[in-house]
Design a protein with these regions (language model features):
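P-loop NTPase motor domains
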Residues: 1, 38, 47-51, 58-60, ...
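Glycine-rich phosphate-binding loop of nucleotide-binding enzymes
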Residues: 1-58
Length: 242
């Protein structure tokens, strides 16, 4: 089910949204809140409920690694539907990353998209990850995935080739520049039952990149174990579609 909350400025839309989120959390429903504006308004309630407040911004130490292939619990789905159709998790992740880079580099041409695809495959291959899903498993830590690449690993491959150096130059902002906080391994709790993703300090092309990172994570979690109730709230949604 979908709900839209509308009203004039100051009518209490954010308050109503937060009240609904807190009541759902009290009922045991997993809650995700994405805040493109006024993220600080969710901080106090988030802390008081033991939630995870994730601030995605160049100045923040928080990071969700956009290149991470996340291990998801599909045990309940398998009980309901039987063994799933085997699909390459690497291929699915790379398709998502193509969307991320199309937002970051909107004028990318067809040749560059192909070269980017090859660079992404090579980046994961260097970590021992192939289209065989079993390659994701960490042989030194059973039950967990291997260490994932970060944007800096991709940058090193792109910058080494003249044909992909333009893409590397644009990506450099997120690797060595003012937004290098994106170039880290995930350092936040992604399993908390009350998660607020604050992207209010982002603007321009970084807003679209940050929104992708937030939605990519939320989508991964909502697909996990479908019988488990989850609620996704987006405050000031117009900021993202306007």
């Amino acid at each position: 089910a979908n709900i839209s909350i509308m009203g004039t400025s100051g009518a209490g839309k954010t308050f109503t949204l937060q009240l609904m989120a807190l009541r759902m959390r009290r009922k045991g429903i997993q809650v995700f809140i994405i805040a493109p504006l006024k993220g600080h308004e969710f901080l106090r309630a988030c802390r008081n409920t033991g939630g995870e407040f994730i601030q995605i911004s160049p100045a923040s130490k928080n990071c969700i690694n956009v290149m991470e292939i996340r291990k998801t619990d599909k045990s309940v789905d398998e009980l309901l539907d039987g063994a799933p159709i085997e699909k390459s998790e690497l291929a699915a992740k790379i398709q998502q990353l193509h969307i991320f880079f199309s937002l970051l580099i909107p004028d990318m041409n067809h040749e560059e998209r192909q070269l980017l695809d090859e660079a992404l495959v090579k980046t994961y291959n260097k970590k021992g990850i192939t289209h065989d899903n079993e390659s994701l498993e960490n042989p030194d830590d059973p039950g967990h995935y291997r260490e994932m690449p970060i944007l800096g690993d991709l940058y090193d491959i792109l910058v080494a080739t003249p044909e992909t150096k333009r893409m590397a130059n644009i990506l450099n902002r997120l690797v060595h520049g003012s937004a290098s906080t994106f170039n880290q391994h995930t350092n936040v709790n992604l399993d908390n039952k009350y998660t607020v993703l604050d992207i209010s300090e982002l603007s321009g092309d970084l807003l679209t990149a940050g929104m992708f990172v937030a939605l990519d994570y939320v989508w991964d979690k909502t697909k996990e174990n479908r019988p488990v109730e989850k609620a996704v709230f987006i405050d000031e949604c117009w900021q993202l579609i306007g």
